[in-house]
């Protein structure tokens, strides 16, 4: 195969785009930005992203997809009140919104119409921040080579959040207006108003810290799930197994946290060696068991009562 010989490209992410191919001859253009859906290879040629996402990539996308759902559930529970019968329907609606948004996002991504995506492999942290690596050969002129080297892991999250927001605005107000009769008029839509705040925050978080989240999300899941489980069990004054079993809601919260623990462990281990990594899942119930065994020494109910009395 004959390839035209040109000077090497400057910069970490500048590449040459294929202009013409005739049999065994390939003609490439000048160094510049690669088209969307391509990234540079070791020879500085722009190559299409044709690989399948790794398990870790899917786990990252799952984490980013879970964030709005968890926040929806939190604010629905926060504003619905203990006696509100609308909370369950809103929880189900939020799950439906996020699920449909994820499916639609996959369908509109390349290749269009299938629940499958093509991607470029993430090699290092700088792949997420190509705008920081535009070369300046003469220290005056900058060659702009910014492109999505981690295609589509960066932009697909924004598309998903957009569909989540659209579906929420189409479905949730009608549901809340119809069934949230136990709430005051000012409280009915507070969970929706909260979403209008946290979606922009999540968008900025992905835009600025997407690369950092990609490498840190397993540890974020483990730390937050451990902290929130301890806070919930303490606030609910759960000091033994009986306190845990008297209400179904407490069991649902416990199992949800166990799923998050397992998700974080699998993400950290990446299940590279299945027979060695699966036993790690036996650690999932350990934090809850440790709390129950040590609660009698700390007496969280006494601490809460003293805090409420201002002592």
UniProtKB/Swiss-Prot annotation:
Could you tell me the keywords of this UniProt record?
Endoplasmic reticulum, Glycoprotein, Membrane, Transmembrane, Transmembrane helix, Ubl conjugation, Unfolded protein response
The residues on the Lumenal side of the membrane are 1-57, 109-149, 210, 272-277
Superkingdom? Eukaryota
The answer, when asked if Lipid metabolism is one of the entry's keywords, is no
Q: Which cysteines are joined by disulfide bonds?
A: none
For this record, the Gene Ontology CC terms, alphabetical, are:
endoplasmic reticulum membrane
Q: Which residues form the signal peptide?
A: none
InterPro entries, alphabetically? JAMP
Q: Does the keyword Transmembrane apply?
A: yes
- GO BP annotations listed: ERAD pathway; response to unfolded protein
Please give the tissue specificity annotation from the record for this chain: Expressed in numerous tissues, including brain, spleen, thymus, liver, kidney and testis.
Q: What does this protein do?
A: Regulates the duration of MAPK8 activity in response to various stress stimuli. Facilitates degradation of misfolded endoplasmic reticulum (ER) proteins through the recruitment of components of the proteasome and endoplasmic reticulum-associated degradation (ERAD) system.
Assembly and oligomerization: Interacts with RNF5 and MAPK8, but not with MAPK9. Binding to MAPK8 occurs before and after exposure to stress, such as UV irradiation. After exposure to stress, interacts with phosphorylated MAPK8. Competes with DUSP10 for MAPK8 binding. Associates with multiple components of the proteasome and with ERAD regulatory proteins, including AMFR/GP78, CANX, PSMC1, PSMC2, PSMC3/TBP1, PSMC5, PSMC6, PSMD8, SEC61-ALPHA and UFD1.
Protein name from the UniProt record: JNK1/MAPK8-associated membrane protein
């Amino acid at each position: 195969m004959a390839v035209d010989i040109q000077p090497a490209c400057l910069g970490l992410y500048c590449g040459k785009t294929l202009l013409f191919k005739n049999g065994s001859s390939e003609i490439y253009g000048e160094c510049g930005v690669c088209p969307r859906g391509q990234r540079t290879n070791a020879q500085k040629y722009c190559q299409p992203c044709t690989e399948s996402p790794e398990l870790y990539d899917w786990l990252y996308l799952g984490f980013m997809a879970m964030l709005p759902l968890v926040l929806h559930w939190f604010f629905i529970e926060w504003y619905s009140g203990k006696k509100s019968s609308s909370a369950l329907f809103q929880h189900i609606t939020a799950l439906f919104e996020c699920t449909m948004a994820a499916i639609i996002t996959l369908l509109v991504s390349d290749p269009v119409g299938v629940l499958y995506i093509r991607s470029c492999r993430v090699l290092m942290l700088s792949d997420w921040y190509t705008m920081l690596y535009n070369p300046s050969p003469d220290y005056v002129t900058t060659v702009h080579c910014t492109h999505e080297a981690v295609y589509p892991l960066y932009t697909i999250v924004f598309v998903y959040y957009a569909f989540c927001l659209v579906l929420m605005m189409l479905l949730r107000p009608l549901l809340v207006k119809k069934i949230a009769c136990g709430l005051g008029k000012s409280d009915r839509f507070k969970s929706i108003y909260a979403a209008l705040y946290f979606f922009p925050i999540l968008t900025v978080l992905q835009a600025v810290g997407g690369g950092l989240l990609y490498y840190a999300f397993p540890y974020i899941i483990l730390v937050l799930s451990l902290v929130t489980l301890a806070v919930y069990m303490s606030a609910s004054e759960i000091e033994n197994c009986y306190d845990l079993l008297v209400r179904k809601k407490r069991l649902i919260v416990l199992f949800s946290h166990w799923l998050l623990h397992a998700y974080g462990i699998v993400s950290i281990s990446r299940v590279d060696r299945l027979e060695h990594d699966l036993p790690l899942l036996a650690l999932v119930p350990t934090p809850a068991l440790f709390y129950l065994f040590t609660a009698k020494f700390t007496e969280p109910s006494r601490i809460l009562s003293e805090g409420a009395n201002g002592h």
